[in-house]
């Protein structure tokens, strides 16, 4: 059986401060750095050997991937970065404290923005300091592709081509794959892999630690699912 290991990035500085992060390129906290290292140690203890790895273009996921692979003594494994694995874009909520947003917009509205499958948060202003439209890492993308806000539905729509073009073919080829990504980009792919309904995915949480493992047969049927170390 082939293995797909999802590692959500370790705690970021904005996770720690309870801020909406999205596409803002925020670093790992000290705790998050240790979580990434511990993830790698769990991988090594489980005897999982990777053939390739994928991550986003955001430093918290890139660093988590590198730290985990290093701790697993597999830093040589090829890593491909893609914006399609980025966190969900939180639009105009980016940088806001979650508790303060609830006070401003109401608990129910913020809950809907965060947890619903297809409701979009307010757009991010084009001149916002965190706007991806002026970020050099997205210069090769058509401007119309760069989001100003996303829900989980849109996140899945842009992550799915990467699954179909990169991750799934590697698994079908018998390769073990590491994906260092984000809570919502992982949730989106989990929805697709497990064929969860729009309502079912609302209750799925992906922790910063430990890594989540999926095992597949040669036809890419899901055989088992578990968290390392649990």
Curated annotation (Swiss-Prot):
Residues annotated as the enzyme's active site: 9, 87
Catalytic activity: (2R)-2-phosphoglycerate = (2R)-3-phosphoglycerate
Transmembrane segment boundaries: none
Protein name stated in the entry: 2,3-bisphosphoglycerate-dependent phosphoglycerate mutase
Role summary: Catalyzes the interconversion of 2-phosphoglycerate and 3-phosphoglycerate.
SUPFAM superfamilies from the UniProt entry: Phosphoglycerate mutase-like (SSF53254)
Species the sequence originates in: Streptococcus agalactiae serotype V (strain ATCC BAA-611 / 2603 V/R)
GO BP terms in the entry: gluconeogenesis; glycolytic process
């Amino acid at each position: 059986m082939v293995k797909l290991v999802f590692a959500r990035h370790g705690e970021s500085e904005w996770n720690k401060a309870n801020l909406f992060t999205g596409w803002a390129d925020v670093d790992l906290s000290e705790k998050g750095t240790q979580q990434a290292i511990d993830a790698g140690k769990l991988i090594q203890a489980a005897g999982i050997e990777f053939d390739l790895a994928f991550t986003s273009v955001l430093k918290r996921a890139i660093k988590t991937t590198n730290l985990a692979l290093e701790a697993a003594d597999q830093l040589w494994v090829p890593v491909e970065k893609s914006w399609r694995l980025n966190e969900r874009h939180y639009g105009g909520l980016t940088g806001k404290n979650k508790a303060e947003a609830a006070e401003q917009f109401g608990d129910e509205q913020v809950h809907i923005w965060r947890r619903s499958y297809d409701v979009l948060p307010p757009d991010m202003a084009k001149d916002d300091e965190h706007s991806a439209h002026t970020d050099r890492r997205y210069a090769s993308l058509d401007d119309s592709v760069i989001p100003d806000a996303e829900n989980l539905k849109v996140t899945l729509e842009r992550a799915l081509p990467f699954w179909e073009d990169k991750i799934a073919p590697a698994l079908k080829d018998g390769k073990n794959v590491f994906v260092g990504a984000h809570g919502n980009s992982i949730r989106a792919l989990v929805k697709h892999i497990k064929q969860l309904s729009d309502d079912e995915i609302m209750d799925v949480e992906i922790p910063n630690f430990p890594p989540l493992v999926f095992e597949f047969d040669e036809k890419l049927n899901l055989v088992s699912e578990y968290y390392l170390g649990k």
